[in-house]
């Protein structure tokens, strides 16, 4: 019944759900809205709060999304952006950003190496913050060596994590819990 006469909206609509914090007609607005909520949380002294934006790869090509990414990197508020890179949109995704995301998501060497490392690390119950930073630095170095381009999101001031298999729910939940502990703007791909 979604998007049918009398059905629910395909976008956030405050009159339909108490969980829709704002109303919109397009999902390219999700990062801007979540960043505004993160800034408001900081101004209100809500230190433990994490604002989350979910955006699809098709919507990521919108100019408003890029403006928000740029501002998120500059403001450094506690924001998690989840990029649902499913290569689905009303029309086919095209352009440089689509090519970039495909390059990141399909680097077989990088993804195999990353999965092997995280599989080994998953056998340890606790990893110290220092060890976590060390591993992240190694991961970033490997990414920059194996991927053709440097990471666009990190160049904009966001910590980048991914790509992650969103169909592996247990692994995804673990990653989301781990990301709660990392302050500042970050993007999960």
Model segments located where?
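Cofactor-binding active-site loop characterized by glycine-rich and histidine/acidic residues
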Residues: 1-75
């Amino acid at each position: 019944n979604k998007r049918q006469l009398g059905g629910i909206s395909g976008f956030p609509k405050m009159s339909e759900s108490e969980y829709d914090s704002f109303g919109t007609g397009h999902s390219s607005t999700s990062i801007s809205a979540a960043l505004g909520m993160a800034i408001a949380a900081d101004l209100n002294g809500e230190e433990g709060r994490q604002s989350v934006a979910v955006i699809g790869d098709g919507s990521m090509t919108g100019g408003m999304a890029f403006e928000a990414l740029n501002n998120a990197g500059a403001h450094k508020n506690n924001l998690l952006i989840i990029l649902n890179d499913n290569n689905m949109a009303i029309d086919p995704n095209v352009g440089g950003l689509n090519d970039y995301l495909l390059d990141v998501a399909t680097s077989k060497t990088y993804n195999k190496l990353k999965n092997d490392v995280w599989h080994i690390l998953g056998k340890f119950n606790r990893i110290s913050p220092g060890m976590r930073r060390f591993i992240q630095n190694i991961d970033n170095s490997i990414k920059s060596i194996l991927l053709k381009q440097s990471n666009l999101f990190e160049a904009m001031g966001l910590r980048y994590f991914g790509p992650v298999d969103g169909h592996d729910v247990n692994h995804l939940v673990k990653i989301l819990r781990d990301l709660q502990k990392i302050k500042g703007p970050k993007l999960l791909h």
